[in-house]
């Protein structure tokens, strides 16, 4: 385990609200509020997208990172001035964090999230929430049983255009949404899948273009329509990636409560 001294300090706030929603005494009374101890599991490509904002957040302190590759964990810890671990459970025991960010391969999201919540931590995990419906339900059940907050990254909801559409829908400016259509054309080379042993697999990634690329756009469709999904019909195909078993093309129809529906065609072998 690599050890570096983490930065930690006390922040003072005035007023009656805390940045994460807690309440303070009204008036000018000042009380001490400690920073949220934060750790990150997984130091791969998406890691900096979590570590950088956490390190800049005045209400949080990054105390540790964890990765199964010691050299990667060590490099991340040195960059952000925190401790490095290769064992997730040991990190939880030693650090006793308030918040855990999960940036691991997909199949690890559910077990790590549940373990962290059972240890009293709030969790923010990268998408997808899980690779199986039963695992996603277990995560929700664990959050409810422990009283911890569970968050899943769907950053496209916060794009300026997405926020504008959501406001227009909430205000009734666009009327009732009865149908939506998704067309997604990405390009993923064979090298994208060969760079790791979990990409392009059913048991570790959980699928192909739907769970990895189209998940964001399909999430926006459901968010804009704003109703529960009642049915899905879809067909999957692999047209240009013979070395992987998962789909690179999918099309289908999503039915929503109240009669609205969405159609989608997605691929990650777009020719440019």
Predicted features, each with a name:
Residues 12-30:
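Short, Lys/Arg-enriched N-terminal segments with co-localized hydrophobic residues
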Residues 25-80:
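N-terminal Rossmann-like dinucleotide-binding module
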Residues 27, 37, 241-247, 257-272:
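NAD(P)-dinucleotide binding in Rossmann-like oxidoreductases
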Residues 50, 80-142:
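Beta-loop-alpha module in the N-terminal Rossmann-like domain of NAD(P)-dependent dehydrogenases
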Residues 137-156, 175-179:
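Rossmann-fold dehydrogenase core element
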Residues 156-244:
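Predominantly a Rossmann-like dinucleotide-binding segment in NAD(P)-dependent oxidoreductases
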